[in-house]
């Protein structure tokens, strides 16, 4: 004798759909947080690569940091990204993955970098020649690059003060869980909460 299979009732289907909706509502914030953490890790990696490029630049340029260009030369010569591009040749590392500003065209002597998400410390990246590392007392406490709202353009240093913790201005971008990633002159990258950074 063949048994007849019963179909699901409407109530059973509604219960299953409700359970799935509850699970989705519970898991969505977890996935969003994981995505944000992944972006923060990628940003840290980007800054670390720029830090390694800067260390190679220092070795090749008499221990002087990249120089900035005069204001009138920002768009035509590009400043610090052009200086580092020979050492960090992936244009993606110049953009934070959380930066949603549109790409702004900037001529960088033919370099592939069209947009930059990081702002350098003008006390380090300064008029030619760049600052000599011997002039910096504690490389591990002086900022080199921070997450910033540059509008996608190349900027050559708008950090206030001497570029240490607590001297960052309003251009910083709080892209990562209420804080930002900061590359220090010695090459290490650290996340800091907004209140600590400014």
Predicted regions and their residues:
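Amphipathic alpha-helical segments typified by the pilin-like N-terminal helix
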Residues: 2-45
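Short, well-structured segments within or immediately adjacent to enzyme catalytic domains
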Residues: 41-198
């Amino acid at each position: 004798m063949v048994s007849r299979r019963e179909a699901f009732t409407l109530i059973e289907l509604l219960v299953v759909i409700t359970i799935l909706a509850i699970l989705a509502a519970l898991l969505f914030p977890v996935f969003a947080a994981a995505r944000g953490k992944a972006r923060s890790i990628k940003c840290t990696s980007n800054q670390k690569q720029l830090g390694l490029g800067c260390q190679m630049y220092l070795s090749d340029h008499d221990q002087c940091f990249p120089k900035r260009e005069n204001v009138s030369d920002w768009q035509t010569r590009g400043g610090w990204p052009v200086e580092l591009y020979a050492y960090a040749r992936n244009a993606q590392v110049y953009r934070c993955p959380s930066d949603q500003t549109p790409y702004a065209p900037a001529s960088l002597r033919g370099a592939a970098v069209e947009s930059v998400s990081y702002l350098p410390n003008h006390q380090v990246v300064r008029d030619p020649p760049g600052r000599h590392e011997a002039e910096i007392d504690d490389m591990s406490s002086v900022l080199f690059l921070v997450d910033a709202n540059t509008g996608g353009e190349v900027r050559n240093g708008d950090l206030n003060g001497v570029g240490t913790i607590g001297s960052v201005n309003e251009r910083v971008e709080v892209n990562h869980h209420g804080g930002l990633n900061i590359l220090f002159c010695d090459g290490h990258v650290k996340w800091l909460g907004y209140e600590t950074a400014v």
